[in-house]
C-alpha cells in the first residue's frame, strides 16, 4: 500500500527543501480510540510547527498512530515562493540548446519562431496553436522529471543505464528551456503573450511532449527513437509524425503468417496453424524505399536505419520494434493549425470534370439502396421512433455549443450562453421554437466551426450546426445504427463486438489464394467530389422511402431529414482570420451532423463495393468479407489460383486506377498477410494497436477539473501500457500528486494520500496496482468511503435558480407530457435530473460546483466526518462475501499462443491461461425484455440505474410504470405475469453489477470470464435457488482469482461455503446498491 505515500513524502521534501518548510501527516482510523489519538497527534503537530519546534518527538510519541492508523493526507507549509524550478534546472542545463530550423514547415506559423516574430503585438497573439490544454504546468512537469532523476542518481546495473539515457535526453530539454527561461503559466494554466514573447512559440508544448517521451524511455532503442523525435520535433511541427508512421501501412504486408487466431462459427478466437506467405511486388518495396528516403530528407537517421535493419528478415519476433516506432511517433504532440488552413485544405483539391460518371452513378445508387435497406422496415411499419422523432431528439439533445452566444432569461436571472439545450428552452419559452423549419446554412447564415486536432494529421474542421439539424436527424440515424448493429460489414457498430472479433475475421480467410485490399478513405470523406453524389444518394433513398408509408408524421420526419441534406449541399462556413470573419463556400462534407459516422460508413461501404464491382470485370474472385470501420475499409478477395507477385501488383494498380477514375485521393494497398487501419493493424497474424495517447498535452480544453484530468492521465497511461507504450509509473504518480493537491492559502497545500485517491468513492483517481480494480473491504477503507459518500451532491445556486424558473419547468413538463400517458414520477424526475445535469456544461455552474466540492474535500482531508452514510455500495456486498471464501494454491498451464504481442507480461499470462473474449459483456440492460418492451412502444430509453430501480418495485408499480410509457395494458399484464419478468430481475441485476465492476474497461475487457479453465478453480456448493447470489459469488471469485494472477503470476483456487441463511440477506442488500461516479469512472467512460 505504501508506495505512493512514500513517493509523496519524498516529493514534498524535494519540492519544499528550505528550512521553513514543514510536512504534517494527517491520519485517521475507524477505531474510535485510535481516531482520538489521530486528532491529538494532528493538533500537537500544528502546535509545534507554529512554535517552530521539531516534530520528531511527536512521531515517536504517537508511533501507534503511524503504525496502525491510515494516512489521510499530508499538509505542507512553505514560506518561500519558489523559483525553485529555475534554480534546479540550471544543474541539468549543461548541454547545447536546440536551434530551430525556421524553414522546415510549409506554413510560416508552424515554424518554431520566437513568439513576437509570429505575433508582433499582444492583440494579435493567440495560444490556440500551442496550448497544451491541460491543467498542469511545464514547471510541474520539469519538477517531476528532476524529482525522478534525483531519486535515481545512485541506481546500479540496468537501472543505471535507464537513468543515464533519461538524463541525457533531459539535458537537451533543460538546456533549451533554460536558454529562454521557464515560461510561467497563469491561474488557468495558460501561457500569455508577455511570458512567451521572447521565447519560441512552441516551447511549452514541445517540452511537454519531450518530457512525456523521455520518461517513457527504458531500452537503448527507446532512447534512440526518443532522441530523434525530441530533437526534430523542436523544428518540425507539421509532418514529423506522419513521416515516421507512414511506412507501417507497407510493413504489415511484409511479414509471413506462421500460425494465427481466426474467428470460428461461434465468434470465438481459435488458433489456426496455417502458414501464409507474404507476397510483395517490387513496386511495394520501391514505395517503402521512397518513404524511408523522405524520412532521411527530414533529418531522421536512427529510425529509418532500424526499419531498414528489420527489412533484412522481416521477422514477427522483431516486429514489436516497428510497432514501437509507430506508437512513439504520435507522442510528438498535436498538430494545431489555423482554422483557415484547416478549411482551405479540403477546398484546394482540383475539381475535374474528367471522372467516370458511370462509377459515380453506381456509387450514388449503392448509397441510395443502403439507406433504403436500413430504413425500410421501420418506415413500412410506421415505427413510433420515426413518428415521435422530434421528442426523441429533444430527449437526447446535447449541451454542446449551438454556434452563437445568446442572452437568455431564466426567471430573474439573465445569462449569456451558447449551449444547445438552453437555446431550445429559451426558444420554446419565447415562441421561437420551430423544429419544422430547418434554418439554411447558406451565405446569409454561414456555419460556425469547431476543430479536431490529432497528432500526425492536419487539423479538421467540425460544423457547429443549429440544433434543428440534430432534432431532424436523430431518430432516423438511430434507426440506421440499429440496422448497422446486426450487419457485420459495419465493424464499428456490430453488436457487442470488440476489435478482436474484427481481427479474427480478417485472418480467417487469409490463404495462399487470397489477398486483402485495405484503403484509408479519410481524404475522400472530406473531398468535394464526395459531397454531391453522397447527399444525392441519401436524398434519393429518402424520396423512395417516403412513398412506402401513409403516416404523415413519418413522412414529415423523412422530409425534414431530406431538408438537412438539401441545405448542406449549399453550405458556407465562417472562419475567424485575425479580426475579420471570412465567409467561404464550403463544398465538402464535414463532421458535426448526427449522421456523420453512420453516413460515412454507408458511403465507404458503397465506395469499396463500387471499386470491387469494377475490378471483378477483369478478375475472377469471391469477396469473402467486406468491412468498413470509420475512415477505413477493407476486403478479403479469394481467387481460384495461387496469388503471385504479378497478380498482387496488377490488382493493386487496377484498384488505384479505379479510385483515380473517381478522382478519390485515397491510400489503397493490397497485401496477402496483413492490414493497417486507423484503429488497429495486423502483422504476422498478430494484432497490434497504436499506443498514441498523449499524456502531457491535450487536444482541447473542457470543463474538467484537475482531479478529472489526473484520472484521465492515469487512464491514458493504462491504455498506452496495454498497447505497448509504457511511461514510468513513478512519473505518472508524481503527476497525480501535483494535480490532486489542493491549495489552501499561498503557502499552505494539502496532498491527499493513496487511500483517498484509490478507494472507490466519488474522489477516486487511480488504482494502487495497475490493471487491478480493488474494492476495499477493510474497516478503514469502508469508513473513508462512507465519509466521502456523506459529502455527495454539491449544489450550485445558479443551477437551482435556472431549474426553478418557469422556462426550465415548462420545458421539462412539456417533455413529460409528450412522453407519458399517465403520471410517472420515476420518469418525470429522471428527465428533470437529466436536464439539470446538462446545465453542468455551462461554465459558471461547473465552477460553482467545483468550489463547493473542493471546500468539502478540504474539510474532509483534515478530519474525516464521522457521519455514517447508510447507503450500500458494491464494497459492502463484497465485504459480506469475502469471509466465506477459502484460498488454496492451484496451477493453470499456459495453453494459448500470444496474439497481442504488446501486452504487458502479467496481462499476457492471464490470456494465455484462460483465453480472451471477442464480445462486450452487456452492461446496460438493453437485452432485457422490459427494455425491449419499452423501446417497442416509446422513445424513452431508461438507463441501467433506472431499470435496476424499476425491476425491484412491486408488480403493480411496474405495470403502472409500463402503462404510463404507452405500453398497452395487455402487454404490461402479460409481462408481469410471465416467467420473463423473473428472468429480467436476474438479468438486469447482472448487467448492473457488471457495470459497477467496470468489466468492459481496462484489461478486464480482454479476459474470457466464462472460461472453463477459470471456472474449474472455483468451487461453490449449490444451495437454494437464488441465481443472483450464485452469480455474485462466482463473479467475485473470478475477479479475486484473476487479480491474484495479475499481481503474482500464479493461480489460486477458491472454495466458498456460503450459509443458506445469509443468502436471503445478501439478496435483499443487492437491490440497494448505490452507484459511485468518480473522476476515475468518468475517465474510463471517456476512453470509450
Curated annotation (Swiss-Prot):
CC per GO annotation: virion component
Cofactor dependence: Mg(2+)
Origin: domain of life: Viruses
Entry's Gene Ontology BP terms: DNA-templated transcription; viral genome replication
Keyword Nucleotide-binding: yes
Matches recorded under InterPro entries: DNA/RNA_pol_sf (IPR043502), RNA-dir_pol_4-hel_dom (IPR042032), RNA-dir_pol_luteovirus (IPR001795), RNA-dir_pol_reovirus (IPR007097), Rotavirus_VP1_C (IPR022071)
Reactions it catalyzes: RNA(n) + a ribonucleoside 5'-triphosphate = RNA(n+1) + diphosphate
Entry keywords, A to Z: Magnesium, Nucleotide-binding, Nucleotidyltransferase, RNA-binding, RNA-directed RNA polymerase, Transferase, Viral RNA replication, Virion
Every RdRp catalytic domain range: 501-687
Gene Ontology molecular function, alphabetical: nucleotide binding; RNA binding; RNA-directed RNA polymerase activity
Predominant location category: virion
Locations listed in the record: Virion
Quaternary structure and partners: Interacts with VP3 (Potential). Interacts with VP2; this interaction activates VP1. Interacts with NSP5; this interaction is probably necessary for the formation of functional virus factories. Interacts with NSP2; this interaction is weak.
Family per similarity comment: Belongs to the reoviridae RNA-directed RNA polymerase family.
Listed name of the protein: RNA-directed RNA polymerase
Organism, scientific name: Rotavirus A (strain RVA/Human/Indonesia/69M/1980/G8P4[10]) (RV-A)
Amino acid at each position: 500500500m505504501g508506495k505512493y505515500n512514500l513517493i509523496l513524502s519524498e516529493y514534498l521534501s524535494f519540492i519544499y527543501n528550505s528550512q521553513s518548510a514543514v510536512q504534517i501527516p494527517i491520519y485517521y482510523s475507524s477505531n474510535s480510540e485510535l481516531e482520538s489519538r489521530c486528532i491529538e497527534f494532528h493538533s500537537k503537530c500544528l502546535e509545534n510547527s507554529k512554535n517552530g519546534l521539531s516534530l520528531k518527538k511527536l512521531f515517536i510519541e504517537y508511533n501507534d498512530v503511524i503504525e496502525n492508523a491510515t494516512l489521510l493526507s499530508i499538509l505542507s507549509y512553505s514560506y518561500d515562493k519558489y523559483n525553485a524550478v529555475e534554480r534546479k534546472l540550471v544543474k541539468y542545463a549543461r548541454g547545447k540548446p536546440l536551434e530551430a530550423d525556421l524553414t522546415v514547415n510549409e506554413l510560416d506559423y508552424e515554424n518554431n519562431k520566437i513568439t513576437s516574430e509570429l505575433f508582433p503585438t499582444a492583440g494579435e497573439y493567440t495560444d490556440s496553436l500551442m496550448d497544451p490544454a491541460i491543467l498542469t504546468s511545464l514547471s510541474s512537469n520539469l519538477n517531476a522529471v528532476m524529482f525522478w532523476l534525483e531519486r535515481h542518481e545512485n541506481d546500479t546495473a540496468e537501472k543505471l543505464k535507464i537513468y543515464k539515457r533519461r538524463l541525457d535526453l533531459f539535458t537537451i530539454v533543460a538546456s533549451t528551456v533554460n536558454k529562454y527561461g521557464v515560461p510561467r503559466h497563469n491561474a488557468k494554466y495558460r501561457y500569455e503573450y508577455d511570458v512567451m514573447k521572447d521565447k519560441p512559440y512552441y516551447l511549452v508544448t514541445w517540452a511537454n511532449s519531450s518530457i512525456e517521451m523521455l520518461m517513457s524511455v527504458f531500452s537503448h532503442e527507446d532512447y534512440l527513437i526518443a532522441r530523434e523525435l525530441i530533437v526534430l520535433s523542436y523544428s518540425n511541427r507539421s509532418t514529423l509524425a506522419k513521416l515516421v508512421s507512414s511506412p507501417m501501412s507497407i510493413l504489415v504486408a511484409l511479414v509471413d503468417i506462421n500460425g494465427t487466431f481466426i474467428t470460428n462459427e461461434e465468434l470465438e478466437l481459435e488458433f489456426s496453424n496455417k502458414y501464409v506467405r507474404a507476397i510483395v511486388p517490387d513496386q511495394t518495396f520501391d514505395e517503402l524505399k521512397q518513404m524511408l528516403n523522405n524520412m532521411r530528407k527530414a533529418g531522421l537517421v536512427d529510425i529509418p536505419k532500424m526499419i531498414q535493419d528489420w527489412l533484412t528478415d522481416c521477422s514477427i519476433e522483431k516486429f514489436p520494434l516497428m510497432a514501437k516506432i509507430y506508437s512513439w511517433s504520435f507522442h510528438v504532440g498535436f498538430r494545431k493549425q489555423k482554422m483557415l488552413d484547416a478549411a482551405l485544405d479540403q477546398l484546394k483539391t482540383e475539381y475535374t470534370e474528367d471522372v467516370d460518371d458511370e462509377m459515380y452513378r453506381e456509387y450514388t445508387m449503392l448509397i441510395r439502396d443502403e439507406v433504403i435497406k436500413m430504413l425500410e422496415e421501420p418506415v413500412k411499419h410506421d415505427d413510433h421512433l420515426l413518428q415521435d422523432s422530434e421528442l426523441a431528439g429533444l430527449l437526447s439533445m446535447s449541451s454542446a455549443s449551438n454556434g452563437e452566444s445568446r442572452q437568455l432569461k431564466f426567471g430573474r436571472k439573465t445569462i449569456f450562453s451558447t449551449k444547445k439545450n438552453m437555446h431550445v428552452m429559451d426558444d420554446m419559452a419565447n415562441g421561437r421554437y420551430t423544429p419544422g423549419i430547418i434554418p439554411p446554412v447558406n451565405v446569409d447564415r454561414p456555419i460556425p466551426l469547431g476543430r479536431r486536432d490529432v497528432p500526425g494529421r492536419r487539423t479538421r474542421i467540425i460544423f457547429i450546426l443549429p440544433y434543428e439539424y440534430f432534432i431532424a436527424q436523430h431518430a432516423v440515424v438511430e434507426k440506421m445504427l440499429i440496422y448497422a448493429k446486426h450487419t457485420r460489414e459495419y465493424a464499428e457498430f456490430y453488436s457487442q463486438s470488440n476489435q478482436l472479433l474484427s481481427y479474427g475475421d480478417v485472418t480467417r480467410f487469409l490463404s495462399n489464394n487470397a489477398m486483402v485490399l485495405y484503403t484509408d478513405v479519410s481524404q475522400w470523406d472530406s473531398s468535394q467530389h464526395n459531397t454531391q453524389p453522397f447527399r444525392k444518394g441519401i436524398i434519393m433513398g429518402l424520396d423512395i422511402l417516403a412513398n412506402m408509408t401513409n403516416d404523415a408524421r413519418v413522412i414529415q420526419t423523412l422530409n425534414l431529414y431530406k431538408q438537412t441534406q438539401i441545405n448542406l449541399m449549399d453550405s458556407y462556413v465562417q472562419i475567424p482570420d485575425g479580426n475579420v470573419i471570412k465567409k467561404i463556400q464550403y463544398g465538402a462534407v464535414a463532421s458535426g451532423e448526427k449522421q456523420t459516422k453512420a453516413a460515412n460508413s454507408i458511403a465507404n461501404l458503397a465506395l469499396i463495393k463500387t471499386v470491387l464491382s469494377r475490378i471483378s470485370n477483369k478478375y475472377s474472385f469471391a469477396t469473402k468479407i467486406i468491412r468498413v470501420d470509420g475512415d477505413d475499409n477493407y476486403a478479403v478477395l479469394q481467387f481460384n489460383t495461387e496469388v503471385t507477385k504479378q497478380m498482387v501488383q496488377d490488382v493493386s494498380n487496377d484498384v488505384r486506377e479505379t479510385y483515380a477514375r473517381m478522382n478519390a485521393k485515397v491510400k489503397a494497398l493490397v497485401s496477402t498477410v496483413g492490414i493497417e487501419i486507423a484503429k488497429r493493424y495486423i502483422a504476422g497474424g498478430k494484432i497490434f494497436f497504436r499506443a498514441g495517447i498523449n499524456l502531457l498535452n491535450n487536444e482541447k480544453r473542457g470543463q474538467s477539473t484537475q482531479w478529472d484530468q489526473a484520472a484521465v492521465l492515469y487512464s491514458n497511461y493504462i491504455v498506452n501500457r496495454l498497447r505497448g507504450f509504457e511511461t514510468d509509473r513513478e512519473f505518472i504518480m508524481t503527476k497525480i500528486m501535483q494535480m490532486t493537491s489542493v491549495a489552501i492559502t499561498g503557502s499552505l497545500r494539502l496532498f491527499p494520500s493513496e487511500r483517498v485517491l484509490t478507494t472507490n468513492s466519488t474522489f477516486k483517481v487511480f488504482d494502487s496496482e495497475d490493471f487491478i480494480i480493488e474494492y476495499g473491504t477493510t474497516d478503514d477503507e469502508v469508513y473513508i468511503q462512507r465519509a466521502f459518500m456523506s459529502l455527495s451532491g454539491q449544489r450550485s445556486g445558479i443551477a437551482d435558480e435556472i431549474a426553478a424558473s418557469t422556462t426550465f419547468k415548462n420545458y421539462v413538463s412539456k417533455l413529460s407530457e409528450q412522453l407519458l400517458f399517465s403520471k410517472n414520477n420515476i420518469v418525470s424526475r429522471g428527465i428533470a435530473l437529466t436536464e439539470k445535469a446538462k446545465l453542468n456544461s455551462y461554465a459558471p455552474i461547473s465552477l460553482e460546483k467545483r468550489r463547493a466540492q473542493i471546500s468539502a474535500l478540504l474539510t474532509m482531508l483534515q478530519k474525516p466526518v464521522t457521519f455514517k452514510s447508510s447507503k450500500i455500495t458494491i464494497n459492502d456486498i463484497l465485504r459480506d462475501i469475502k469471509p466465506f471464501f477459502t484460498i488454496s494454491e492451484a496451477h493453470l498451464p499456459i495453453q494459448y499462443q500470444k496474439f497481442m504481442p504488446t501486452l504487458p507480461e502479467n496481462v499476457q499470462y492471464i490470456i494465455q491461461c484462460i483465453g480472451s473474449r471477442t464480445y462486450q459483456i452487456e452492461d446496460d440492460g438493453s437485452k432485457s425484455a422490459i427494455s425491449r418492451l419499452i423501446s417497442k412502444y416509446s422513445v424513452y430509453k431508461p438507463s441501467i440505474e433506472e431499470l435496476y430501480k424499476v425491476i425491484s418495485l412491486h408488480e403493480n408499480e411496474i405495470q403502472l410504470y409500463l402503462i404510463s410509457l404507452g405500453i398497452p395494458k395487455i402487454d404490461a399484464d402479460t409481462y408481469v405475469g410471465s416467467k420473463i419478468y423473473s428472468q429480467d430481475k436476474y438479468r438486469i441485476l447482472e448487467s448492473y453489477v457488471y457495470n459497477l465492476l467496470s468489466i468492459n474497461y481496462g484489461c478486464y475487457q480482454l479476459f474470457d470470464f466464462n472460461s472453463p479453465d477459470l471456472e474449474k478453480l472455483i468451487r461453490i456448493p449449490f444451495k437454494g435457488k437464488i441465481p443472483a447470489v450464485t452469480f455474485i459469488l462466482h463473479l467475485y471469485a473470478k475477479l479475486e482469482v484473476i487479480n491474484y494472477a495479475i499481481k503474482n503470476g500464479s493461480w489460486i483456487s477458491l472454495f466458498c461455503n456460503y450459509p443458506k441463511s445469509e443468502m436471503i440477506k445478501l439478496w435483499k442488500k443487492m437491490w440497494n446498491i448505490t452507484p459511485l461516479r468518480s473522476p476515475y469512472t468518468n475517465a474510463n467512460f471517456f476512453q470509450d
